[in-house]
Amino acid sequence: MARSLVESEALQMGVRRLSSPLTSPVQAEVYFPRLTVPFCGHIKGGLRPGKKILIMGIVNLEPKSFDIRLTCGDSEDPAADIAIELRAEFADKQFLRNACVSGKWGEEESAIPYFPFIADQPFRVEIHCEHPQFRIIVDGHQLFDFYHRVESLSAINTIKINGDLQLTKLG
């Protein structure tokens, strides 16, 4: 039986939604229909050890910076806790990370073996939630670990992305 183009696209969209790396075959936990920057999306059920977040995109042609934040909600006043902020700074070629709990920023970490991002090139960032840290993998290479500063992993339920990049996939 032949399917119309609309039916085929709808079926493919449904398959993509249910086969995301953060989902079980039965229920989608993370589904982002529009990937515009700045981006804010909900992570159903929050984080837990074993859960992975995938961010794929393309760095803009003349980038200054971009950041990825995992937060405990999206409140602005009072500001939600930031479990991890990853910030790529192109002028200094740094990939910085920090957390902000109860309105107080911790000590910023900056040591990396190399700067993985290139202007006008695609990238793949994986944030693995493990016990007791986040493991950050860029383009298949482990770059660093960042120890949890937020006590309740399940409270980390929002992802925010901003800056000089185009998003192509989240999962």
Swiss-Prot record:
The keyword rRNA-binding does not apply. Keywords: Lectin. InterPro entries: ConA-like_dom_sf, Galectin-like, Galectin_CRD. Residues 38-170 form the Galectin domain. The keyword Transferase does not apply. Pfam families: Gal-bind_lectin (PF00337). Disulfide bonds: none annotated. SUPFAM superfamilies: Concanavalin A-like lectins/glucanases (SSF49899). GO terms for molecular function: carbohydrate binding. It comes from the Eukaryota. Does not bind lactose, and may not bind carbohydrates. This is Galectin-related protein A. It comes from Xenopus laevis (African clawed frog). The lineage of its organism: Eukaryota, Metazoa, Chordata, Craniata, Vertebrata.
